[in-house]
Amino acid sequence: MPILSLSSTRNSVLTRIYDYLKALVQQVIVPNVEDDKSSKSTPFEKLEPAKQNHPQKDCCATEKDDLVDVSELFPKQNNKQLSLTSKSSVVPCALNLDNLETPFSIKIDNNGAVTTQLNLDEPILRGPSRGEPAKLQNDLISSPPLEESYINNDQYKALFPSNFLPITPVSSVITPASKKSIDESPLSDEVQGIADESSETLPYICHYCDARFRIRGYLTRHIKKHAKRKAYHCPFFDNSISQELRCHTSGGFSRRDTYKTHLKSRHFTYPEGVKPQDRNKSPGVCTQCGEHFSTSESWVENHIEAGSCKGLPEGYSEGIREKKKTSKMKMIKTSDGQTRFISSDESVSEPALQNKNCIEATVMQSKERPNDKIIPTKTEKNDFGIGTQWFERKQISRPTQTTQSRGPTEVQNLKEWSIISPPILSPQNASSVPQEYQSSRYTLHMDSPALSSASSALSPLSGDPITTTETNKSYPLDSEQSLLEPDKTEEDAINQSKESNMISINEMLQKQMDFELLGENHLKETQDYLALYKKAYGIEF
């Protein structure tokens, strides 16, 4: 009895183990009955359907990623940003040399020879051709429409306002916002001078180049560009030593900040190991006298500019005080009603002497200065046009001589005397400031009374003054005085000198603006460039 019970228990345990293993095998390996009926296939062919039905999982994927559909690498439809092409002001470059209208055209014949021609008779059209605006408009209209949500976006409204127009050379440069920023910018002197010279909002005029400015400080800084002698000069600059040992090339500076930077870097000694960016807060020693200072800024203001340094040259402190009194700008109104601002003597240059208003304003200022010692009287040739020479005025003492009535022989010799007209002054080798402008002492006394027949004979000596026996007055023989016009006034002589000078300047400018000559020069330069291009690259046009 016990033996039978044990055998039955063993059979039942084995049966259960077999059923468990069978169920486990069925779960791991799923048999396909139809595969047995079909034709035999390789093991690799059997694995392909299994791979398609059971794709491999990404080991880095999470449960959150499984919920989102993963898109392909390249989408089926183009999802480009439509805002880049819709209502865009940027037009693709489509330069057509055949339709390009320029004042200078180049043609190439069958033999490869290049011929050039100036289009002087044809008007130059600036901008797009006739059919181009309509084409651009059609391109903008035919652009794909944008979504309404994108159009209502604040960023889109800021980029493309309602009154949007394509960019033009004027609208892209000058806008209400950009004009305001240009007016307030302290770094654009040239823009300030170019913008709307006839506007009343630019009352400050440069008396050298007629540039206008809205703020007086801009004009003061602009005038320094015309200066021959800079506003600031290094007191330790020595021109006698060699160029390699000098602290600066010229020692002159137009701006105070560059002047102070030069002093701090070349004439102030810092401790070892101090970086350049930390020098403003670092102490140091004066190179000239050896005195110690907490900062370089205090050394410049309290030691150098105050004149307390022992190494400064003699008279440096007095020169600074005198400069503060005399270097301020002064407002002068000219005869045509314009307001001119004259600065110190450091801001005189050659172009100023060719300006009528500048001449008048300079003369008015020179007459009002208390210590009227120096005035520009002559200019030298300079490529940059700022080479004014300064000369001290010297009083010329002319002895007053009287002449008696001359005999018939002297009168006959006087008639044969050749009268030489004053030469035409050129803007390079002659002064545009006439001699009578230099001082009231040198004005022409041309208001002569009617000469009698006995006293009408003039002295043949050009150096002798003209006198009469009735009035006993002396008339100097200046270049503006003509022997045949004794009743000529001082104003007529001044106008004659100005007109002769302006005529020569106008003739010179007219020669420079000769279009045929400019075209020939342009043609020659183009031919040289084509020859060089052909030689370098071996390409013929």
UniProtKB/Swiss-Prot annotation:
Keyword Repeat part of the UniProt annotation: yes
GO molecular function: DNA-binding transcription activator activity, RNA polymerase II-specific; DNA-binding transcription factor activity, RNA polymerase II-specific; RNA polymerase II cis-regulatory region sequence-specific DNA binding; zinc ion binding
Topological category with respect to the lipid bilayer: Peripheral membrane protein
ZnF (C2H2-type) residues: 204-226, 232-267, 284-309
Highest taxon, organism lineage: Eukaryota
BP-aspect Gene Ontology terms: positive regulation of transcription by RNA polymerase II; regulation of transcription by RNA polymerase II
UniProt keyword Zinc present: yes
Residue segments, region Disordered: 35-58, 452-497
Note: Present with 6490 molecules/cell in log phase SD medium.
Quaternary structure and partners: Interacts (via Region II) with SSY5; protease component of the SPS-sensor.
Protein name, per record: Transcription factor STP2
Organism placement in taxonomy: Eukaryota, Fungi, Dikarya, Ascomycota, Saccharomycotina
